[in-house]
Amino acid sequence: MKLKNIKIEERMEHYNVNGLSIALFEEGQIRGTVNYGLLEVNSDRKVNDDSIFSACSISKFLTGIIAIKLLEEGHLDLDENVNERLVTWKVPENEYTKNKKVTLRNLLSHQSGIKDPEGSFLELNSDIGFPSMVELLEGKSHYCKVPIEVQFEPESEFHYSDAGYCILQQLIEDVTKKQFYQVVNEFIFEPLGMKNSQLNTTMSEVDRDNFSCGHNKNGELVDGKHPIYPYPAASGLWTTSLDLAELVLELMNAVKGKSKLGISESLAKEMITPQRGKSWTGLGVFLEGSEKELEITSLGWGVGFQCMMVAHPHLEKGAVIMTNAELGVHQLEGIIGEIYKSLLS
């Protein structure tokens, strides 16, 4: 993938985007990065290869990789009722779970029958602090005031769900007996050398010099500068375009039987296979096209940030695009979409 027929700095000015980072990869290797602009408006902090952005919901792709790794090691089962392994909290049984159960497969593919309550899963309120996953799932927190339960028969409908990934986080913590960020460090960040990546549960302990601030569609700083989402598995990842590219490459290499994490070729292929008749959703990723033209994507959109990862596993190419601007429109309708189209041209 190469950038063609686009003047990025001109487009950044058009969209009021302060900072942007792109990593390009091909044939199993990172081919280069390009960085533009500033980490914070009206500062002298320039975006570089070590600049850290909020990946927002691309965190779900990371969680998908962890789940598949734990599945490979026998800690999880793809089609087993998750209540068999959940300890701290369990999915409430009701009329919708009589015939089909909530499983790892349908949680990862947003088909568990769970729908996020309106107005839930917003950014951290520093006066209230971090909720526990149990408080969230029981509807006993500011961030989710309604208990999470199955509202449709599992695998009957698709509903994009942060709550589903909170259940996945609790499941991962229960089976490993470790905090989620510890599992991520041990199973993902350290083996892949993702030294500039971390989850928001550890944000208070870091030097934020390399961290980008979030900005609104007018290019102005958002409140708090670094919006945090207290749901690490759903939206807690802070990372660089380079580190995120390493994670995407891990999946692409695993599909060819060359995983650094020990993920089998068969399970890697299952991640990028349409699930339960829904052509657009795999396990932790979204899909477009088929066979050699298959495209996998993951999008992030939160307060002050938008980003995208795109990969063509069979053509062995892809890109990560990270910005510190929330434009108020879908990624493909703003500067990320223009860059994406440039890469495909």
Segments the model singles out, each with a brief description of its role:
Residues 1-38, 50, 84, 119, ...:
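Catalytic loop of the DD-peptidase/beta-lactamase superfamily, centered on the K-T-G motif
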Residues 44, 150, 225-229:
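Acidic/His metal-coordination segments adjacent to aromatic residues that form catalytic metal sites
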Residues 48-53, 152-157, 233:
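A short glycine/serine-rich beta->alpha loop
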Residues 62, 99, 163, 180, ...:
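A generic structural signal for residues located within well-ordered alpha-helices
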Residues 63-64, 164-169, 245-246:
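Well-ordered alpha-helical segments within folded domains of soluble proteins
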